[in-house]
Structures are given as C-alpha cells and as structure tokens.
Curated annotation (Swiss-Prot):
Family under the similarity heading: Belongs to the transferase hexapeptide repeat family.
Annotated keywords: Repeat, Transferase
Organism, scientific name: Escherichia coli (strain ATCC 8739 / DSM 1576 / NBRC 3972 / NCIMB 8545 / WDCM 00012 / Crooks)
Record keyword Repeat present: yes
The protein's name in its UniProt record: Carnitine operon protein CaiE
C-alpha cells in the first residue's frame, strides 16, 4: 500500500478496511471500518481532510481531494463508482455516485441519492434525500425508487463482502501462459445483474 505522511499527518485506516496496494493515501485521510478502496484510487489529504465512513467503497481510479479547512466526506455505506472525482464535497449516507461523475466543491449529495454515471454536480449544489441526479450540470429529475435503492444496497453489499474476500485471497502473482482446463468463474454474493 502507498501511504504517505504529509506535514505530520498520517492516514488512518481501520484494520477491517481493504486498501488495494496500488491506491495512494496522503496525509489527512481517515478510512472507516469495512471500507473498500480500489486499485489506483487517489485520496490526497494534503489540503483538507478526507473521511470515508464505515461500509463505503471508493472504486478503481477514483480521486478524492479537497481544500483547506474543509472535510470531503463519503458517508456510511456510500458507493463511489469507477473513475469518479470528489472534490471538497459531502456524499450522504447510503448514496451512490455513478462512474466517471464529478462532484465539485461545497456540493452536498443527499442520503440515499443516486448520481447517474458521467454527471457533473456543480460547486455549491445542495441536494435533498433520495434524489436521482442526472446530467451536466446534474439536476434532480425525480425521487429514487424503492427498487433502485434496493439495487444500490445490493451492489454496496457486494463491495462490503469483497473486503473480506480480498483480505482472504488477493495476492500478487505471475500470469498463466494459457487457460487451464475447466477454469472456474468468480461468483458474487448477491445477484446484482442489471435488469434490462
């Protein structure tokens, strides 16, 4: 893992969290219990404090950064999709930020909300509970349905289960030269296949 002290501040990572070895955590970063931090994630606590609360996940290639005297927060059971950028914002409890979305300074995403993939949330946006936000700039189009929230929670549970799976079996290795006979397929712990 790449952990760096900065001006006397050392990242804090709960022992039950999983941080991928290629992720980088710098300075004032606090990672809670059962959190998943994916490959190539960058959490730069060299200006403001970054807080990832219990059960949240920060997926591959995500960036978290902030500015002085502020906290950038991902709330409990927050779900941050691949490639998302969070800058000086607050993501509410049980909210989802879709892949490659950008959430700007001072924005607040309400709890149980969903930000659609590729959305841009402007600085200072103040969201309410359980909103579906879509677009560039993002706007609330309706409330998140019970089915959508259930789907989000199943996906978050997959990442919470992945923490233990990674602790138990993830290790660096050399690649095989060919596919072995009867190669098994990996299985998740819940069925999160998108409905068409």
């Amino acid at each position: 893992m790449s952990y760096y002290a900065f001006e006397g501040l050392i990242p804090i990572v709960h022992p039950t969290a999983f941080v991928h070895p290629s992720a980088v955590l710098i300075g004032d970063v606090i990672v809670g219990a059962g959190v998943y931090i994916g490959p190539l994630a960058s959490l730069r606590g060299d200006y403001g404090r970054l807080i990832v609360q219990a059960g949240a996940n920060i997926q591959d290639g995500c960036i978290m950064h902030g500015y002085c005297d502020t906290d950038t927060i991902v709330g409990e059971n927050g779900h941050i999709g691949h490639g998302a950028i969070l800058h000086g914002c607050v993501i509410g409890r049980d909210a989802l930020v879709g892949m490659n979305s950008v959430i700007m300074d001072g924005a607040v995403i309400g709890e149980e909300s969903i930000v659609a993939a590729m959305s841009f949330v402007k600085a200072g946006f103040s969201g309410e509970k359980r909103q579906l936000l879509i677009g560039t700039p993002a706007r609330a189009v309706r409330s998140v349905s019970d089915d959508e929230l259930h789907w989000k929670r199943l996906n978050t549970k997959e990442y919470q289960d992945l923490v233990g799976r990674c602790h138990a079996s993830l290790h660096e290795t050399q690649p095989l030269r060919q596919m072995e006979e009867n190669r098994p397929r990996l299985q998740g712990t819940t069925d999160v296949t998108p409905k068409r």
